[in-house]
């Protein structure tokens, strides 16, 4: 019985160990430029291969169609070791991601 408990405990500990060091990732680069109400730009890069850049611009200022148009790109390394990249826009027509791994409608 004691050996069963010890084996079960060892299995539980082994299963709890993270497979990737993402919890220890460090921020290598961070930029943030708040242009005020008319726009923004920011980006970051982490030690585990994540990158993200985004900018936004206010369009049609002072009209009923006023809105922000966002453009960006992010990438990350998946559990399979492949780097996935997505470029996107978001605005009046919704969120539009584009990436080699994303199916096209």
From Swiss-Prot:
Residues 37-105 form the Chitin-binding type R&R domain. Disulfide bonds: none annotated. GO terms for molecular function: structural constituent of chitin-based larval cuticle. This is Flexible cuticle protein 12. Residues 1-16 form the signal peptide. InterPro entries: CHIT_BIND_RR_consensus (IPR031311), Cuticle_Struct_Prot (IPR050468), Insect_cuticle (IPR000618). It comes from the Eukaryota. Pfam families: Chitin_bind_4 (PF00379).
């Amino acid at each position: 019985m004691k050996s069963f408990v010890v084996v079960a405990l060892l299995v539980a500990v082994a299963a709890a160990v993270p497979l990737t060091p993402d919890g220890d990732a460090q921020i290598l680069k961070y930029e943030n430029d708040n242009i005020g109400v008319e726009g923004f730009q920011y980006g970051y890069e982490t030690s585990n291969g994540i990158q993200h850049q985004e900018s936004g611009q206010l369009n049609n200022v002072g009209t009923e169609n006023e809105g922000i148009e966002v453009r960006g790109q992010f990438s990350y390394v998946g559990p399979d070791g492949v780097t996935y990249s997505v470029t996107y826009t978001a605005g009046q027509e919704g969120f539009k991601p584009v990436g080699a791994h994303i199916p096209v409608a």
